[in-house]
Amino acid sequence: MQKSRKKKEKKKQKNRMLMAIMLIILYLGGLFVYAIPDLQKIVLQKENEKAVEHFKEEVEGSQQDKSGEETDSTSADSNQIPKNAQLYQEMQAYNQQIFSDGQSGLTDPWSYEQETLDLSQYGIDDGMIGILDIPKMDVTLPLYLGATQEKMAKGAVMLGQTSFPVQGTDSNCVIAAHRGWKGIPMFREIERLEIGDELTVQNCQETLTYRVSEIEIILPDESDKIMIQPGRNMVTLMTCHPYTQNSRRYVVYCDEVGTQPEAAVDAAEEADSSQQEIITTSEQNRTEALEEDQRLIERDTLWRKAGYVGIGLIGVLIIFGFIPRKKH
């Protein structure tokens, strides 16, 4: 009788142990699946940081190679000009070309995936042409040429048939990015930008600073809204709107600092003034839409944190559920 009882007790403990192991495996599996977006975020951020650092090193290396060597680009053999300088000249020439052509090939910007220059001849195989830094949004992204899905998954992209971000006038570099991608914010917090805020774009030769001059919400097919504006050197940021949808486009127009037209400067000063009394109906509607987007972003963040708290509590219950209780 005693042996039979011990045997049953042993079997019960064994079954209990197997159940505990199964629950732990299921729990860890569920935790891993839930954490995948955050793990992807860590991996992608590391890759972005690596790409950004590599680009900076390449630019610094090129600048050091040509330091002390003054070359007259109008008379020297093009083979004697550093590759970055050649690329920069080709970018400027391309900007002049599309302005002269009236950007005739520009339709729905999201469909423009092609690289407008052959970057491989300059030793650029990944299509990265710069670094976009937006302090107000706390994001630094690699900038790629061509809006392919693969490149948009890695950072910001310059749309085809728009200008390169280099010095000059009559140019508008349209930069697009996802409204958040696999945990990386990208342009998720684009509504933080206000008129007067600044951002920088580092190209293969220099770092240019741009100031926000206007913000607008447009339809996807309103390509005329992102065309070159004569006399201005611009960067235009664009992403889907509203948050989690893509029925419209949220557009932020920026002018290179020092080249802003008088109207844009006046707009920035007006936005900074606490005495602003007139708010148009369209601006009121835009503000309400932005507040709704911000609520959705905050809700998603809160639910994500709450999910981890819930998973933690389940883990505690599993542990306490299988701790042997002392018999009185």
Question: Would you name each region that the model predicts?
Answer:
Residues 6, 11-305, 324:
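Solvent-exposed, non-transmembrane regions of membrane-associated and secreted proteins
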Residues 32, 313-326:
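Alpha-helical transmembrane segments
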